[in-house]
Amino acid sequence: MNAGLALLIAGWVFVLIWVPIVVLSQRKMHPKALFTLFFAELWERFSFYGMRAFLILYMTSRLFDKLSQADSDGASYGIYGAFNALLYASPLLGGMLADKLIGFRKAIITGGLFMSFGQIVLAYNAFNGDTELLFFVGLSFLAIGNGFFKPNISSFLGTFYDRNDSRKDSAFTIFYMGINIGAFLAPLTCGYLAREVHYSLGFLLAGLGMLTGVLVFYKNRAVFEGKGLPPDIPFLKSSFIAGINREWAVLIGAFLLVPVFSFLIQAEEITDYILLLVGFGILGYILFNAFKSDEKEEGQRLLVFMALFFVHMIFWALFEQAGGSINILTDRYVNKHGIETSQFQSVNALFIILLAPVFTWIWTVLGRKKLEPRTPMKFFYAMLQIALGYLIIVVGAKSILPEVNEGGLIPIVFVLGMYLFHTTGELSLSPVGLSVVTKLSPVKTVGFVMGSWFVSIAFGHKIGGYLGKLIASPPEGATKGMELQAFINVYMNWGVYIVLGVAAILFFISPTLKKWMHGVH
């Protein structure tokens, strides 16, 4: 038995023991809906992270294998960034449709089915010739489906708690743990089988995971107690155009977006312009609402949201190198001791599974003592930790520069150290970020604001794609040492210096942000 298969088996055994412990220890403190959403999101993340674990490797080794390494890497980073940008921009539309028209439940089921189909298209394509056309169609279904699913399952969870319910951060941390249980199992399973058996099997298992999530959500809908339904069912069922009601119009419109997204994933410059327009539109709309609001508190909370939006964007631009350039770095320059490259994507999720309860306990204890940091300071600590993670991998890479041309490899401990601090940074930012967005948002626009929050990740991914291209730009005939130096330069300049600069600005404006939050923690 090789190391990769041993990890796969050990991972499943660990989760089958750990999940019941988490659920049973928390079930009396929270509504039953939390645990239905926990399992639905677990399987959705299994689907996404299963594909993400090997997507960049599939592109460089199969889809663009006829290009030079530099050209293949550059094309793959660009597509990876554009796809993920659309993946996280689409929740803006999905959040609005759920708020105004179809409700959270229908949005979540529609998104899950779209993503299942997208994974199946990718599986078929990998098995039958690796054509770019079908590849982009599959990615488009995933991006559109994510738009319906991602913002609405988080917003739906928020409806089961009052604005200042002390259990809310705890609930979102448990929910976030569900995300990462799926993210832990997926690379171990889909990533391993994709590389050891066939890429099509990895995509297929990811699709079946998403179908499982939809089934869990639908079969347990009774626990939702009337929440998440369309805001106006007669209006939804009324005719929109040519005898087609509004519900069917939404579905048809989603299908019509598939060729549009397929084009945009390839047309990076056009995608850039669209993202800029969307970004300025979102921020302009939020700014307009902040200043026109009749309630001063509501307006100032929206201004806090905008500040956190920018910090969030920079964080994810660097954090999400994990599925892109860090995956390539691991594949080519790290001593993996027989572990599949894609399985390293499980390290972050494993640390979250282990550390999320610790962070929940820390925030709870500090909260009781009135010492818990406000959200802006948690974001500050997150930025410090991601910078430390990049500093660790830079030190590891520099340590082998003299012998990399002769086959020297980065010791695995540096990769694990980087993932550890990136994980603690993520735990300081992401679950509390989801929670605070629902608290800062006006009730009538929570879906839109949550969608806007995911757009900040879209911008982060787009920036991340450009960082990947900087890494993929050594001159023709570059040695391994020159290629590794490109990783070092980008990680040091962006992952350390720029991140620390953003952290310093956030530290100095935190007192003002705290004041403008008006009691929201």
Question: Predicted segment positions?
Answer:
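Intracellular loop-helix junctions on the cytosolic face of multi-pass helical membrane proteins
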Residues: 1-36, 163, 191-327, 331-337, ...
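Hydrophobic core of transmembrane alpha-helices in multi-pass small-molecule transporters
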Residues: 38, 42, 46, 118, ...
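Short amphipathic helix-loop junctions that connect adjacent transmembrane helices
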Residues: 53-77, 322-344
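Central cavity-lining transmembrane alpha-helices of secondary-active solute carriers
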Residues: 78-99, 346-363, 459
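Glycine-rich segments within core transmembrane alpha-helices of 12-TM secondary carriers
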Residues: 87, 167-187, 194-195, 202, ...
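Cytoplasmic membrane-interface "Motif A"-like loop-to-helix N-cap segments
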Residues: 100-113, 298, 365-384
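C-terminal ends and interior cores of transmembrane alpha-helices
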Residues: 110-130, 384-404
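Intracellular juxtamembrane helix-capping segments at the cytosolic ends
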Residues: 148-162, 427-442
